[in-house]
Swiss-Prot record:
Function: Acts as a chaperone during the assembly of the 26S proteasome, specifically of the base subcomplex of the PA700/19S regulatory complex (RC). In the initial step of the base subcomplex assembly is part of an intermediate PSMD5:PSMC2:PSMC1:PSMD2 module which probably assembles with a PSMD10:PSMC4:PSMC5:PAAF1 module followed by dissociation of PSMD5.
Organism (species): Macaca fascicularis (Crab-eating macaque)
InterPro entries: ARM-like (IPR011989), ARM-type_fold (IPR016024), PSMD5 (IPR019538)
Subunit structure comment from the entry: Interacts with PSMC1, PSMC2, PSMD1 and PSMD6. Part of transient complex containing PSMD5, PSMC2, PSMC1 and PSMD2 formed during the assembly of the 26S proteasome.
Gene3D superfamilies, alphabetized: Leucine-rich Repeat Variant
Protein name: 26S proteasome non-ATPase regulatory subunit 5
Keywords, sorted A to Z: Acetylation, Chaperone
Record PTM N-acetylalanine, positions in chain: 2
Domain notes: Rich in dileucine repeats, which have been implicated in trafficking of a variety of transmembrane proteins.
GO BP field: proteasome assembly
Family the entry assigns: Belongs to the proteasome subunit S5B/HSM3 family.
Any single Gene Ontology cellular-component annotation: proteasome accessory complex
Length: 504
């Protein structure tokens, strides 16, 4: 088959209008294993295919792109970088986006290869074209360009090429295209900044991080909403958080939240600002963040009462994030009856809100109630039990009812709540004392789809692996759980058949 492909490739090179040959080559290549093509890589002459891309013929272009995609995979990245550099440069300025995407996918292979990436770094014109691809209308092209530049910047040589040459001017020039492109460049800068303190230093020296932060705290509410997402990404790293604190950005974000009550347009940016603090609290110290920025906790409680489902959803998510570790749980516990009212509200919403918000409420409840075995002190167990009780008059029945609704996502989210409390003795006693609950847990006929079967299996696993389950559920039920566990999530009980003498 590889020989046939090579013969067709030679035919394509020989003819002026080889449309039928391209179709045949495209068809043959689908059947040739990649390892066979690799063995013939030295024989592959791709010049004619690249030349055909310059003809304004839609079908030829589509066929050539597909053929090149396959053949280039058979070539080593170093070979592509050294021998096809002119074709790569032309590909990046081709009017057809599929050609640009093909070219960028090859550049993606090259920058992943430590031997080949040098060829890119030494090609200023190619780097410039990659930068200008960020400004194109096609999002896939822009994303691929951002990914390649981000990968290039992982090395010292890459950082220098991007920030200590004319390329930085090209980057700033591209930013002026429009708002969308400017945000794409910010996205690239944040990706690079997140790698290391040194990378962040290059980005801050360029002035682009400062520009992003200036827009974040500026007057345009829509710009704020976009910029806070990128700043939140930067805050995922320790050095990023340090930088934001040193520059006073965290204090500024807090002050904007304080002033949000008098801003009629605060609903545009407030959810993002609250999310920022939620993530900050979990990554650093919930207690320190909540004590230093009390407006954050205040605003979360306020937003759970909002009639705006966007606000409520973000507040619920943030409570879940905040309560995902013990320190965060204790911070919430200190708010006393206010948090009890919040739990009651979340419990109510998990039953009565639109489906999407129900799921977010259930996820938050799971996060709040989960306690790893090594952290199950008497005080913390009493706390999670009291939280569970605050959710509803009969919370176990509430979640069991939700789990019986015909929405797989809701069903899984309710099972996740049971799984979160499954290793806590007080919850095991509750489950055991509810008539039919143990039977419900080991009944495989309830779950029909894969995600539901997986969720049920996680519940069984959490129960079966608990040290207190045999004592509370009793040995027969414990053995049923162990059997379920050993059979796996997708076990189907074989149907027994009885042979009857004389039956046809």
């Amino acid at each position: 088959m590889a020989a046939q492909a090579l013969a067709l490739l030679r035919e394509v090179a020989r003819l002026e209008a080889p449309l039928e040959e391209l179709r045949a080559l495209h068809s043959v290549l689908q059947a040739v294993p990649l390892n066979e093509l690799r063995e013939q890589a030295a024989e592959l002459r791709l010049g004619p295919l690249f030349s055909l891309l310059n003809e304004n013929h839609r079908e030829k272009t589509a066929l050539c792109v597909s053929i090149l995609e396959r053949l280039l995979q058979a070539m080593e990245p170093v070979h592509v970088a050294r021998n096809l550099r002119v074709d790569l440069q032309r590909g990046l300025i081709h009017p057809d986006d599929s050609v640009k995407i093909l070219t960028l996918s090859q550049i993606g292979r090259i920058v992943e290869n430590s031997d080949a990436v040098t060829e890119i770094l030494n090609n200023a014109e190619l780097l410039k074209q990659i930068v200008y691809c960020i400004g194109g209308e096609n999002l896939s092209v822009a994303k691929a360009a951002i990914k390649s530049l981000s990968r290039i910047s992982l090395t010292q040589a890459g950082l220098e090429a991007l920030f200590e040459s004319n390329l930085l001017d090209d980057l700033k020039s591209v930013m002026k295209t429009n708002d969308i492109v400017r945000y794409r460049v910010y996205e690239l800068i944040v990706e690079i900044s997140s790698v290391s303190p040194e990378s962040l230093n290059y980005c801050t020296t360029s002035g682009l991080v400062t520009q992003l932060l200036r827009e974040l705290t500026g007057e345009d509410v829509l710009v704020r909403a976009t910029c806070i997402e990128m700043v939140t990404s930067l805050a995922y790293t320790h050095h990023g958080r340090q930088y934001l604190a040193q520059e006073g950005v965290i204090d500024q974000i807090s002050n904007i939240i304080v002033g949000a009550d008098s801003d009629p347009f605060s609903s545009f940016y407030l959810p993002g600002f609250v999310k920022f603090f939620g993530n900050l609290a979990v990554m650093d110290s919930p207690q320190q963040i909540c004590e230093r920025y009390p407006i954050f906790v205040e605003k979360v409680f306020e937003m759970t009462e909002s009639q705006d489902p966007t606000m409520t959803g973000v507040a619920v998510d943030t409570v879940g994030i905040l309560g995902s570790n013990v320190e965060g749980k204790q911070v919430l516990q200190k708010t006393g009856t206010r948090f009890e009212r919040l739990l009651m509200r979340i419990g109510h919403q998990s039953k009565n809100a639109p489906v999407e918000l129900k799921i977010r409420c259930l996820d938050a409840i799971s996060s709040l109630l989960y306690l790893p075995p090594e952290q199950q002190t008497d005080d913390l167990l009493r706390m999670t039990e009291s939280w569970f009780s605050a959710l509803s008059r009969d919370p176990l029945e509430l979640f069991r009812g939700i789990s019986s609704q015909p929405f797989p996502e809701l069903h899984c989210a309710a099972l996740k709540v049971f799984t979160a409390i499954a290793n806590q003795p007080w919850a095991q006693k509750l489950m055991f004392n509810i008539p039919g609950f143990v039977e419900y847990v080991v009944d495989r006929s309830v779950e029909q789809d894969k995600s539901s079967k997986d969720a049920k299996y996680e519940l069984v696993k959490a129960l079966a692996n608990s040290k207190t389950i045999a004592e509370i559920f009793g040995n027969p039920n414990y053995l049923r759980l162990r059997t379920y566990l050993s059979e796996g999530p997708y076990y189907v009980k074989p149907v027994s058949t009885t042979a009857v003498e004389g039956a046809e």
